[in-house]
Amino acid sequence: MERNVTLDFVRGVAILGILLLNISAFGLPKAAYLNPAWYGAITPQDAWTWAFLDLIGQVKFLTLFALLFGAGLQMLLPRGRRWIQSRLTLLVLLGFIHGLLFWDGDILLAYGLVGLICWRLVRDAPSVKSLFNTGVMLYLVGLGVLLLLGLISDSQTSRAWTPDASSILYEKHWKLHGGVEAIGNRADGVGNSLLALGAQYGWQLAGMMLIGAALMRSGWLKGQFSLRHYRRTGFVLVAIGVIINLPAIALQWRLDWAYRWCAFLLQMPRELSAPFQAIGYASLFYGFWPQLSRFKLVLAIACVGRMALTNYLLQTLICTTLFYHLSLFMQFDRLELLAFVIPVWLANIFFSVIWLRYFRQGPVEWLWRQLTLRAAGPAISKTSR
């Protein structure tokens, strides 16, 4: 089957875009990921960097990746139950190892677990409309839970939002020194992530996967609509997302990132805007693909998308080496950390282009496929129940 190069490019953009936000999770304490005032004060440089990234990227690229993951579930249906379940179970195992031994910001475990539930919903959906509507409903349930958490939360700040000096020093200690102590702390992080997944985030993740599957089943993610449709839809959706998110960014700044409002209630506009912007970004890429595809860089980014899993793990290896093993953790502010993003992007791009000159799949993708074959046997042509 001929590859959808546009889809590969969108996936590549998602993988590269995720690093714009993850770089602060690698280079700064965990609290800094959502709270630019994590150390109790904030410089204008940090505030403006946070605001810009929040507007264009925070949650948006993860949402785009979840959308494409759901599209992948739709594409995998012909391979059958054993193949899909084996593939996703292996992803869960990989995510657990990644989160326990390498980095506490893993997303693979969550995607694998939610995927194990969602693929059946995708398979059993009687129509594109029902699949899409179910996805929207699940996403809204997740937002409702987030609202409830905000309403019942204490106004007093949490140590996870604004950690004290001893907490920051301890996090720096175990991240730089590694060993059993680091594994124990990452294990706690995996446990907390699973609790958040079951209570709130999993609803949103499942919703986006189903929406992505619906867009693939309808032909939208196959590029079967007109260029005018994609362009118009893209501009409208991105504009809607910005209009929803921008006031919340300004209000968080105005409130000095106060815990109750900014850790919960003012996260909602961002979470609500993310699907609009993510789908809008994808729509613009499809709409302007005839122009974009002329550039070698665009085709190189499509290679990154073909090796998405390999490149996600490569980002972890590079960034943990830089910030933990070479002791660059907490040495740079939010804006300065962005200087590390472009070299990592270049590593992703060059490695992908060179590798795919000689091989059909990325190394981790190849291993994933081989292990799936061993676990499930050859894929079958009909989706078994």
Where are these regions (language model features)?
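Long hydrophobic alpha-helical segments that form multi-pass transmembrane helix bundles
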Residues: 133-215
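Solvent-exposed interhelical
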Residues: 80-82, 119-134, 214-236
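N-terminal signal-anchor module of multipass membrane proteins
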Residues: 1-69, 76
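Alpha-helical transmembrane segments of multi-pass integral membrane proteins
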Residues: 205, 259-358
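Membrane-interface interhelical connector segments
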Residues: 32-35, 251-265
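Specific transmembrane alpha-helix
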Residues: 63-78, 109-122, 200-223, 273-293
